[in-house]
């Protein structure tokens, strides 16, 4: 059984459940919440790498990242993103971005599993809805956007 708690902002919902055991009906509700709210959050989950990937496969084919080293040969799709206090320079993915958008066939969904979470306000991962952003644009800008193309690149 899952419980869906919509975020008070315009995007996202917290899902209360145990991801180690859920039914087909629960999965339908998870997917429905994902489509409705754009991003879903699961707090206090204790998943092994194998359980994490098993859960991820419910949402489609797993992506490989040829430029990034996976956790291990057994789990190449799990990319460890970490920053130590002693690290210098820009953080991986610190600027606004859409995961994997630069690939030929980007995955429909992205998952992030936090093992160590910094104190609130010290390092924030934020989410936004491009659907809502577009919806609130003036008509003249929407019309202009229909005539142009964007090129995505991870080259910088």
Ranges and model annotations:
Residues 2-156:
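Non-heme Fe(II) oxygenase catalytic core, chiefly the N-lobe of the double-stranded beta-helix
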């Amino acid at each position: 059984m899952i419980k869906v708690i919509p975020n008070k902002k315009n995007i996202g919902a917290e899902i209360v459940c145990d991801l180690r055991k859920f039914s087909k009906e629960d999965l339908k509700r998870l997917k429905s919440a994902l489509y409705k709210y754009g991003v879903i959050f699961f707090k206090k989950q204790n998943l092994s790498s194998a359980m994490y990937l098993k859960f991820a496969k419910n949402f489609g084919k797993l992506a490989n990242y040829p430029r990034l080293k996976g956790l291990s040969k057994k789990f190449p799709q799990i990319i460890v993103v970490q920053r130590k206090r002693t690290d210098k320079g820009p953080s991986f993915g610190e600027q606004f971005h859409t995961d994997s958008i630069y690939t030929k066939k980007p995955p429909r969904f992205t998952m992030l599993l936090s093992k160590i979470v910094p104190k609130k306000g010290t390092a924030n991962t934020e989410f936004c809805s491009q659907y809502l952003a577009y919806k609130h644009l003036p008509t003249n800008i929407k019309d202009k956007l229909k005539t142009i193309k964007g090129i995505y690149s991870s080259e910088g």
